[in-house]
Amino acid sequence: MKDDHGLEPHSVNFAPRLNWLRAGILGANDGIVSIAALVVGVAAATSDSGPIVVAGIAGIIAGSLSMALGEYVSVSSQRDSETSLIKRERQELQDFPAEELAELAEIYEHKGLSPSTAALVAKELTAHDVVAAHLDAELGINERQLTNPWHAAVSSAVSFLAGAALPMLAITLTPDNWRILFTFVASLVALALTGGIGAYLGQSPILRPVLRVTAGGALALALTWGIGALLGSNTSL
């Protein structure tokens, strides 16, 4: 019988990849849904292109800044917390080396290793890189892979702008009679693509994320279109 396990891809650094993927997909989806819903709602309230363009541009600027700021604050808080934990772990290793070695051995013993094997693993890992060994086993932290908050902020802003560009172009370049429908369809197709790409890169089933994100986007667009149409009709009375 052929063993195909050797063909299965494995990645040691998969967690950072998922973090960047999450931020990128979230930013793009937020840009698509936010700006599409905004311009569709305004277009439902008025046929004048001026307010639609102004609202779209304002939404893009506000949304990209909000995404960047939110990601910067979130990642900075996480990094500060991880840095504090790393500092404390270094101090404990300096003050209580024997106790920390016993703790590391106990961790691997709880994972199923025999006491003698766990002690040997702990000693070898400690000899290789004592700080990295304890950070990984006790806290799940890799000191070399702490996320840069500035990188995260720029990534979120750029991904939001990339997602927001599609509905903005769709609503401004399409004839008046078709712009709402075309923006609606183009946005849902874009959401399906981002959902599918995210699932593929994350090595998860594709159908469920695609259905989930397109259903949510359709609901958001339908609600804002309805509210815009209602407000537009009331204003014209």
Region roles according to the model:
Residues M1-A23, V75-A157:
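Cytosol/matrix-facing amphipathic helices and coiled-coil assembly/linker segments
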Residues M1-S74:
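Internal alpha-helical transmembrane segments
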Residues G27, G31-L38, A133-N177:
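Structural signal for alpha-helical transmembrane segments and their flanking helix-loop junctions
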Residues V54, A58, A62, S66, ...:
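Alpha-helical transmembrane segments in multi-pass membrane proteins
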Residues Y72-S76, N142, G195-P205:
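C-terminal ends of transmembrane helices
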